[in-house]
From Swiss-Prot:
It holds the Pfam family AMMECR1. This is Protein Tpen_0748. SUPFAM superfamilies: AMMECR1-like (SSF143447). InterPro entries: AMMECR1, AMMECR1_dom_sf, AMMECR1_domain, AMMECR1_N, AmmeMemoSam_A, Uncharacterised_MJ0810. The lineage of its organism: Archaea, Thermoproteota, Thermoprotei, Thermofilales, Thermofilaceae. It comes from Thermofilum pendens (strain DSM 2475 / Hrk 5). NCBIfam families: AmmeMemoSam_A (TIGR04335), TIGR00296 family protein (TIGR00296). HAMAP family: AMMECR1 (MF_00645). It comes from the Archaea. Residues 7-207 form the AMMECR1 domain.
Length: 213
């Protein structure tokens, strides 16, 4: 599928929020609206990230803290439908956090990352891998046997990682040693993401552009 417009991205983010609101308050899984644009009915991978806004009264500024992130790496569902299910799962099923409560809805922002189909990274030796990855452009999936780890493109940017660190943390996410990528036998996939995020809880939605390193 092609790139989404700002309006389509805003629809997805608002759909993610409404899905979580309805699920937490009424235990109901919503359906995509009947007037959902055709572009949002195409199958696509998608991740929904929920971040809690924490205000430091002394510094007089806010920071964001992860509250949940779950999604579909592969295009297995229509985008709008996948966004609904990913949003609910991010709010209630992320094993790193307790399920969200309705009172938290006014203190979190929603981010939707629409993914391209993951493509395998061809390499002959592990030393080639860092040169085949662009921080700010690529997200990573690493696989070794049944182990699998995924990191979105914005994670490497937010953490200030270089390609080697990105690979190492993707391995850790898969439950492997951080240097597993250096020993061969690892399947590595890369993908890109178009990112839309609320600027404030229930506020405007903007597209986030990452700086490619």
């Amino acid at each position: 599928m092609g790139r989404l417009s700002a309006e389509e991205g805003a629809l997805l983010v608002r759909l993610a929020r409404r899905a979580v609101e309805e699920y937490l308050e009424n235990a109901r899984v919503i359906e995509p609206p009947r007037d959902t644009p055709p572009s949002l009915r195409e199958k696509s991978g998608v991740f929904v990230t929920i971040e809690k806004i924490l205000v430091d009264p002394l510094a007089r500024r806010a920071r964001r803290e992860l509250r949940g992130c779950i999604g579909y790496p592969e295009p297995v569902l229509p985008l709008a439908e996948a966004t609904i299910h990913a949003a609910i799962a991010a709010a209630t099923e992320d094993p790193r956090f307790p399920p969200m409560t309705p009172r938290e809805l006014d203190t979190v922002v929603f981010e939707v990352s629409v993914l391209t189909k993951p493509e395998p990274v061809d390499y002959r030796s592990p030393e080639e891998l860092p040169d085949k990855i662009k921080v700010g452009r690529d997200g990573l999936i690493v696989e070794y046997g049944a182990a699998r780890g995924l990191l979105l493109p914005q994670v490497a940017v937010d953490e200030g990682w270089d390609p080697e660190e990105f690979l190492s943390y993707a391995c850790l996410k898969a439950g492997l040693r951080d240097d597993a990528w250096r020993h061969g036998g690892l399947k590595v996939y890369r993908f890109q993401a178009q990112i839309f995020v609320e600027t404030t809880p229930k506020g405007d939605v903007v597209e986030r552009f990452l700086e490619v390193v």
